[in-house]
Amino acid sequence: MVQRWIDWNTDTGSELVDIGTHKLHIACLGPPRKLGDPAVLIVPGLGSSITGWAAVRRQLAQVIRVYSYDRTGYGESDTGIEAPSSIMIAHELDLLLRKAQISPPLIVVAHSWGGILSREFLALRSGDVAGMVFVEANQEHTLDILDWRLLANSPVLTGVDRDKVHNIENLHKLNKEEWEIYQTTEASDKHQKQAALEYEQYPKSFPVLEAKSQLEQQPPILRSRPVCVIKGDNGRDFQKLFQAGIEKGNGSESERVAFEDVLTTWDVKDQALQRGNLKLSSRQKYFEVPFSGHNLQLTAPDAVVSGVKWVIENIE
């Protein structure tokens, strides 16, 4: 039996929760929650810790209870023995919520690969999800149509300082302490090792989700529960990286052409892919945040909060 020091419905704080095989770290912020009140659950992207969501959590906690957690191997959570597949991650999240006795309804906020992970969680607990916010999120056809890894691993980007090009250090909206914690956490050996394990599992997760045919279900799997999709500007990020690579003299002519060919149709394909997640519900909202890059939780937390507030307002 888990010894609980925190009442997850009324207290704020964080704790390690034993899910049987190991312990996961979970934190909660925001006003006390009565039975039946919705709460936000944040699912970060590939190789990402929850520390990058500090500004979003801080703002959301003014209006709603917010739960966030470190996946296996990240932050204060234990390392695990199982490969971090999308199925395993969703299973562990389900266990965590049950062990901590955190009840639905939940508004799931998912970023990047979190789009895949959150929908595996949806497959487990579709009745417990009151709404969803997809932030620059993947879906099952992402790698088939727009495999960003072809650009990320291109010789054109050899030696390019990606953080410097993205200028996140000057664009982020974290406070000084939050930024320092974020940098320290994500630079740690523990974090990097777990991120590498997730990268191995990443491509395997897409056909697994596709087999569930969630986007084809009628009526939609969430019926009229609200879904908001927020698109950033990842294509602009890659365009800036491309220019930096060219300035370094990187890549052969054919490699440069191949890179530019992907960028030419990036926005059209990216928009269609991200809009695809709207098929999960008949109640939908879509908007874009120009000049924000991929990591809106860092550069445009206000936009994420706006999407969550729309979901709150549209829960029946």
What are these regions (language model features)?
Residues 272, 279-316:
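Catalytic active-site module of serine/aspartate enzymes centered on a nucleophile-bearing elbow/loop
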Residues 103-146:
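Conserved hydrolase catalytic core segment
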Residues 52-54, 77-83, 144-146:
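Conserved catalytic-core motifs of eukaryotic protein kinase domains, centered on the activation segment
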Residues 22-76, 124:
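Conserved HGGG/HGGXW glycine-rich cap/lid loop of the alpha/beta-hydrolase fold
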Residues 133-166, 204-209:
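Flexible "cap/lid" loop of the alpha/beta hydrolase fold
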Residues 4-23:
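N-terminal cap/lid segment of alpha/beta-hydrolase-fold proteins
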